[in-house]
Amino acid sequence: MAASVTVIGIDPGSQCTGWGIVREASGVLTLVNCGAIRPKGADFAARLGDLYRQLADVVRAHTPDEAAVEDVHAAQNVATALKLGQARGVVVAACAAHGVPVIDYRPSVIKKALVGTGRAEKEQVGYMVGQVLGVRPDWKLDTGDALAAAICHLNQRRLTRLAGLA
C-alpha cells in the first residue's frame, strides 16, 4: 500500500473549471491546493486550448496519482451540453497526456458521498468539504465540487481497500 496518494478532483466547465488537490496519508485527508480556471480566448476553440494549457500546468505542478472528474450531467440545453462535453474532453486529455488515470463520477454520486443525498445543493457540498478537510470553505462553488470529487474518490479507494478488493 502506498504511503500516500494524491488526487486531483476536477469539475469541468466551458466557462469555469474547478480543480482541487487532496492528499491522503495514513487515512488523513489534506487539502494541498485548489482553484478555478476561467479560460480566455477570442472564440470557443481558443478557450478550450487555454483550458488545456492551464490545467496541464496544474497537473505538472502537483503530479497527482489519479484524477476524479465529474461526469457530464444532463443539460436542458443541447448546445450547453455539447460545450460541457467538449470541455470535459479537454480535461480528460490534459490528464491523460501527463499519465494521470481518470476516474469518472456522476454528480449525484459525489453529492451523496459527501452530504448523504444525491440532490444536495452546491453550498451544502462546499460546507461538507470544509468539514472533511478541516478548512473554512472560501473557494468558488466549482472548486468545492472539484474537491468533493477528490474526496469521493479517496473514500472509494479506502472502501475498496477495506473490502479486500484492491
UniProtKB/Swiss-Prot annotation:
Its cofactor is Mg(2+). GO terms for biological process: DNA recombination; DNA repair. It is found in: Cytoplasm. GO terms for cellular component: cytoplasm; Holliday junction resolvase complex. Its EC number is 3.1.21.10. Keywords: Cytoplasm, DNA damage, DNA recombination, DNA repair, DNA-binding, Endonuclease, Hydrolase, Magnesium, Metal-binding, Nuclease. The keyword DNA-binding applies. GO terms for molecular function: crossover junction DNA endonuclease activity; DNA binding; magnesium ion binding. InterPro entries: RNaseH-like_sf, RNaseH_sf, X-over_junc_endoDNase_RuvC. The active site is at D11, E70, D142. It catalyses: Endonucleolytic cleavage at a junction such as a reciprocal single-stranded crossover between two homologous DNA duplexes (Holliday junction). Mg(2+) 2 binds at E70. Mg(2+) 1 binds at D11, D142. Binds 2 Mg(2+) ion per subunit. SUPFAM superfamilies: Ribonuclease H-like. Belongs to the RuvC family. The RuvA-RuvB-RuvC complex processes Holliday junction (HJ) DNA during genetic recombination and DNA repair. Endonuclease that resolves HJ intermediates. Cleaves cruciform DNA by making single-stranded nicks across the HJ at symmetrical positions within the homologous arms, yielding a 5'-phosphate and a 3'-hydroxyl group; requires a central core of homology in the junction. The consensus cleavage sequence is 5'-(A/T)TT(C/G)-3'. Cleavage occurs on the 3'-side of the TT dinucleotide at the point of strand exchange. Homodimer which binds Holliday junction (HJ) DNA. The HJ becomes 2-fold symmetrical on binding to RuvC with unstacked arms; it has a different conformation from HJ DNA in complex with RuvA. In the full resolvosome a probable DNA-RuvA(4)-RuvB(12)-RuvC(2) complex forms which resolves the HJ. This is Crossover junction endodeoxyribonuclease RuvC. It comes from Nitratidesulfovibrio vulgaris (strain DP4) (Desulfovibrio vulgaris). The gene is ruvC.
